């Protein structure tokens, strides 16, 4: 979990709901019972009874529901009169179809909603924890609206639905072809092709080895020729008139329903990528929905025919977005609504009030990636269901009535991994067909265990039927093969072993998968100082990743710390202090801090310590004492730097206990040496020293560059490398 920041108000009281009419469920031998799991526990256990997701719900989930409780009361009093008028009109013209009754929204109602939306629950535990999981069936009015939609524009869209449509080719492929591909994936038989797309970008593509040739797709510069729903064509062309940069290489694989891992995400290109993903997600929801509606109409028309229509999953949600903050969710939703252009957005004001916030003006000097991630509402505890009808997008829909789910890993896990086994539920993930993870590197800094937990529960057989019509469920769902058809898209600023594990373990798409990574020049060549800085890298031996922390600690205490202590205790000049030790892992930080506090070796060394869990008073004290020389050494975690991006003064020498994951941090931390212009030459001579092992290959490549990393890992003539 991220350190606490300024949060938007949490919690609301739940309104009463009308009774929900459900269809009888089906039973089948194909649905496996999943035994109740034990709660996994961990540092987020405190949220089991404290969801804080501000989710209260109105009555039945039809697209004519109103945000105002006053409308409901008014409707009750007016209902007998309205029903009488409707009866008279129907009698007068029995051939005319009954028109759908909609509620009008008045200014007074909006003011009432505004007052209700700012009410904060005194105790978040009073919220109904499983309210967003309650199942509701489409109302009769929605069904009528759907039939009208099929008659109105079904023919126009049908031209786009052919065998060349990636949607049809991917999800409706022949069973014998699918079986061969699934077997190849299960046997881990992949055919791979690699290509240098440009001087700064590499592509690796893999597909199940079934004997077919494999090549790379051509770049996509315009979406004009894509098989999009007619409703999306015009707004998509307006927002994405031209595709540029790396997105040209990514887009063909995204719209072809292949798994995508992109490791070169930048703030400058995030808007374009977000729009591309929004187009793809909405297009998928609309095509899935229209296919079901057209088949519904066909069943109603051909009631005596023996139709075998396989067009559904077990549950309604089809798209899952995993995002780091509420503000990131707002940006995605804005892209979605601007593309879908609904006539009505139910609960939109409440969504903006609880999810959006203004940027902190004091952060104008912060780096762009920091402002993008933490700007606005940076709360990492949320989940949201979006429901699409012909003219409406409904916010805060229950998950089983939603088409899309947007959530943070923490927000989603709190309802999946509750202490009460009866309340645990992950069936709403059973039919997810598109998973989109944006800013995956930010999720690493929160708690990657939540992400891994969610991935392990994707596309499992549901424990309950949830009103499913199993005669319409696709065969590969029933055969428990949905994970081989699911598309996963993950965007990150850089690749880590955890992210690579997702690529190899969870990206099992029968259509193939790609990994797109940059060619790094190296952060050491981009230091912000006006003078050259001595940058030294020391390699130590490590037998395995599990033994790496012990080997690193031993090398640090015997080789690095001994010389550091000598300089501090015997020095009479300016070199005796100002030593910043940057530690990537919090566990390593605790180990080093305890060693400084208890070891005889560091008995005469004064030090301060700052981590992501330090309170503000301790942080200010440690920074002040380090700047004025009272502390010779300052221990500093990479994760703290990620969340705060402070400028540390008084630094004369930097020791990297391990190279940082984020290459931007290298330049920022080296820049601390130049905070005092009068002593910049001395600080440049003190320079930077970093420890690394062969298990740090991915991190090291980003720091020293793609061309240098191989020699530094394999060099047998020495284990010290210096760059100036």
UniProtKB/Swiss-Prot annotation:
GO molecular function list: rRNA binding; U3 snoRNA binding
Bias (Acidic residues) ranges: 34-74, 123-166
Entry superkingdom: Eukaryota
Main location: nucleus
Basic residues: bias regions: 7-24
Record InterPro entries: P-loop_NTPase, UTP25, UTP25_C, UTP25_NTPase-like
One annotated Gene Ontology cellular component of this protein: small-subunit processome
Region ranges (Disordered): 1-167
Function: DEAD-box RNA helicase-like protein required for pre-18S rRNA processing, specifically at sites A0, A1, and A2.
Family according to the record: Belongs to the UTP25 family.
Protein name, UniProt field: U3 small nucleolar RNA-associated protein 25
Organism, scientific name: Aspergillus oryzae (strain ATCC 42149 / RIB 40) (Yellow koji mold)
Highest classification ranks of the organism: Eukaryota, Fungi, Dikarya, Ascomycota, Pezizomycotina
């Amino acid at each position: 979990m991220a350190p606490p920041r300024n949060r938007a108000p949490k919690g609301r009281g739940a309104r009463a709901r009308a009774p929900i009419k459900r269809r009888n469920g089906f039973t089948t031998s194909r649905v496996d019972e999943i035994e109740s799991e034990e709660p996994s526990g961990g540092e987020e256990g405190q949220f089991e009874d404290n969801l804080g997701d501000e989710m209260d719900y109105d009555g039945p989930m039809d697209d004519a529901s109103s945000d105002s409780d006053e409308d409901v009361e008014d409707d009750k009093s007016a209902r007998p009169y309205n029903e009488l008028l409707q009866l008279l009109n129907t009698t007068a013209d029995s051939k005319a179809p009954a028109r759908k009754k909609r509620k009008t929204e008045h200014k007074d109602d909006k003011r009432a909603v505004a007052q209700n939306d700012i009410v904060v629950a005194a105790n978040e535990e009073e919220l109904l924890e499983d309210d967003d999981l309650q199942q509701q069936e489409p109302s009769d009015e929605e069904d009528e609206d759907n039939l009208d939609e099929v008659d109105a524009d079904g023919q126009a869209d049908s031209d786009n639905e052919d065998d060349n449509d990636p949607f049809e080719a991917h999800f409706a492929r022949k069973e014998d072809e699918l079986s061969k591909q699934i077997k190849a994936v299960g046997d881990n038989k992949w055919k791979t092709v690699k290509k240098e797309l440009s001087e700064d970008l590499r592509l690796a593509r893999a597909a199940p080895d079934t004997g077919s040739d494999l090549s790379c797709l051509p770049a996509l510069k315009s979406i004009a020729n894509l098989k999009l729903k007619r409703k999306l064509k015009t707004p998509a062309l307006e927002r994405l008139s031209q595709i540029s940069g790396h997105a040209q290489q990514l887009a063909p694989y995204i719209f072809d329903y292949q798994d995508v891992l992109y490791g070169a995400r930048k703030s400058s290109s995030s808007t374009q990528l977000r729009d591309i993903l929004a187009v793809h997600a909405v297009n998928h929801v609309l095509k899935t929905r229209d296919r079901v509606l057209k088949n519904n109409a066909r069943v109603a028309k051909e009631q005596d025919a023996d139709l075998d229509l396989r067009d559904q999953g077990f549950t309604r949600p089809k798209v899952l977005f995993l995002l780091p903050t509420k503000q990131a969710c707002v940006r995605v939703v804005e892209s979605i609504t601007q593309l879908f252009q609904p006539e009505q957005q139910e609960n939109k004001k409440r969504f903006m009030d609880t999810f959006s916030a203004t940027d902190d003006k004091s952060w104008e000097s912060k780096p762009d990636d920091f402002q993008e991630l933490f700007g606005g509402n940076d709360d990492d505890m949320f989940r949201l269901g979006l429901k699409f009808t012909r003219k409406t997008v409904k916010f805060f829909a229950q998950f089983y009535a939603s088409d899309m789910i947007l959530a943070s890993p923490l927000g989603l896990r709190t309802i999946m991994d509750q202490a009460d086994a009866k309340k645990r539920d992950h069936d709403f993930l059973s039919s997810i067909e598109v998973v989109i993870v944006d800013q995956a590197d930010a999720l690493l800094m929160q708690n990657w265990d939540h992400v891994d937990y969610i991935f392990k529960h994707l596309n499992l057989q549901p424990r309950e039927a949830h009103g499913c019509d199993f005669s319409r469920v696709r065969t590969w769902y029933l055969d428990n093969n949905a994970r081989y058809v699911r598309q996963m898209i993950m965007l990150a600023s850089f690749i880590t072993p955890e992210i690579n594990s997702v690529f190899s373990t969870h990206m099992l798409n029968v259509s193939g998968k790609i990994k797109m990574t940059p060619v790094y020049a190296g952060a050491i060549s981009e230091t912000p100082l006006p003078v050259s800085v001595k940058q030294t890298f020391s390699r130590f031996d490590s037998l395995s990743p599990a033994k790496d922390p012990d080997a690193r600690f031993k090398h640090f205490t015997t080789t690095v710390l001994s010389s550091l202590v000598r300089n501090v205790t015997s020095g009479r000049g300016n070199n005796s202090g100002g030593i910043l030790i940057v530690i990537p892992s919090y566990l390593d930080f605790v180990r080093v801090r305890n060693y400084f506090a208890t070891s005889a070796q560091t008995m005469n060394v004064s030090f301060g310590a700052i981590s992501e869990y330090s309170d503000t008073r301790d942080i200010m004290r440690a920074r002040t004492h380090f700047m004025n020389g009272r502390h010779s050494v300052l221990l500093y975690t990479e994760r703290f730097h990620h969340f705060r991006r402070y400028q540390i003064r008084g630094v004369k020498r930097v020791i990297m206990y391990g190279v940082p994951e984020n290459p931007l941090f290298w330049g920022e931390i080296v820049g601390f040496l130049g905070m005092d212009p009068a002593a910049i030459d001395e600080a440049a001579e003190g320079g930077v020293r970093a420890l690394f092992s062969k298990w740090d290959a991915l991190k090291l490549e980003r720091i020293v560059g793609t061309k240098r990393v191989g020699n530094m890992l394999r060099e047998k003539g020495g284990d010290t490398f210096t760059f100036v």
